[in-house]
């Protein structure tokens, strides 16, 4: 965890003419390499990278204070894209139980219906 953004920063630095996109999760933000990367992007003035945070409010072990995380991310990189994702939209996935739940075919169909209804 936390290595995708470092690779993305390296790619953006190696080829300033290419747009690079990076996605990190809120749980991944516990890694120091994420914060070092965000700081480097800001301090170096790197313009060819776009960082997105998928914030569902959970790490693998505990809930995350998403409001605090968003403020902290914006302090490190004001242009960061912060996406709050809904974790209770699927009735069979609840909080940390979702990590260990084995989906059935019916669950997949329900999930597809939930996603289709959002379009």
Show which residues each predicted segment covers:
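Glycine-rich ThDP/TPP pyrophosphate-binding loop and its adjacent helix/strand module
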Residues: 2-119
């Amino acid at each position: 965890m936390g290595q995708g953004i470092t690779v993305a920063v390296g790619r953006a630095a190696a080829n300033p003419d290419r747009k690079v996109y990076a996605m990190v999760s809120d749980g991944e933000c516990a890694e120091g390499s994420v914060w070092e990367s965000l700081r480097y992007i800001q301090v170096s003035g790197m313009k060819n990278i776009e960082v997105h945070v998928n914030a569902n409010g959970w790490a693998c072990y505990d809930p995350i204070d998403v409001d605090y995380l968003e403020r902290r991310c914006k302090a490190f990189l004001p242009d960061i894209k912060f996406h709050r994702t809904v974790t209770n939209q699927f009735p069979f996935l609840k909080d940390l139980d979702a990590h260990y739940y084995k989906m059935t075919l019916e669950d997949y169909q329900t999930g597809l219906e939930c996603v289709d209804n959002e379009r």
